[in-house]
Amino acid sequence: LKTTPLTLRSPFLHRLPLRALKTHKPTSLHISKSSISASLEAGVGVMATKLGMMSFFEESGTVVPVTVVGFREGNIVTQIKTEATDGYNAVQVGYRRVRDRKLTKPEMGHLEKSGIIPLRHLQEFRLQSIDGFEVTQKLDFGELFKEGDLVDVSGTTIGKGFQGGIKRHNFKRGQMTHGSKSHRQLGSIGAGTTPGRVYKGKKMPGRMGGTKRKIRKLKIVKIDDQLNIIMIKGALPGKPGNLLRIAPAKIVGKNIPKS
């Protein structure tokens, strides 16, 4: 009996499902250099508490709107991660002292392992080098920053609840007179038979606010060591009492590699 070689044009293969012809190759995790550099911080930062806004008069007489930021007990290095143990270099910082019962047992065990007081918030700062940092080290804002420096500030915006399209997306309202019954309604959300559906991402009423936002390249106007506060030019996310994350501003090519 003669056997013909099996090829992709064989009629037998056309009756097989497509998934039977696929060959599964082992996939390897590939992390590009651009994603690594994008996650790097320009330097270690601190956490702080938003206190409110006010006007600040510069020496030239210019009035500048500033946000007053205060510091509670904390900003202590709780853990140092290295490429050998964790695959990347990072400094973990704790902020805001609380009572023991406010933390879970795993959180308490993590801090007690290093002999650190109970801290409510833990955040990491991924760095190129972790030289000069040690556990239980106290981070002083005045030693890390100076007046005139640019910083990136992250925080959670004020939650507005469920809002309509006018407030949430700045839509225009409809006619208020001339027989109109749709004053603040959304209006048309798509076509008819084609495409026969509503496109994903359509701006519609929904929950507004309560999301994480980062404001970049804000100027430090004033540092007051006696009152333990700083003043940052502009508005910061959240309401008074909100947690803020302050880090050196990322400037690609200067303190962040291009690739």
Curated annotation (Swiss-Prot):
Transit peptide: 1-37
Single Gene Ontology MF annotation: rRNA binding
Database matches in InterPro entries: Ribosomal_uL3, Ribosomal_uL3_bac/org-type, Ribosomal_uL3_CS, Transl_B-barrel_sf
Annotated region described as Disordered, given as residue ranges: 176-211
PROSITE patterns for the chain: RIBOSOMAL_L3 (PS00474)
Positions with biased composition (Basic residues): 199-211
Pfam family, one: Ribosomal_L3
Family, similarity comment: Belongs to the universal ribosomal protein uL3 family.
Quaternary structure (record): Part of the 50S ribosomal subunit.
Protein name: Large ribosomal subunit protein uL3c
Lineage, opening ranks: Eukaryota, Viridiplantae, Streptophyta, Embryophyta, Tracheophyta
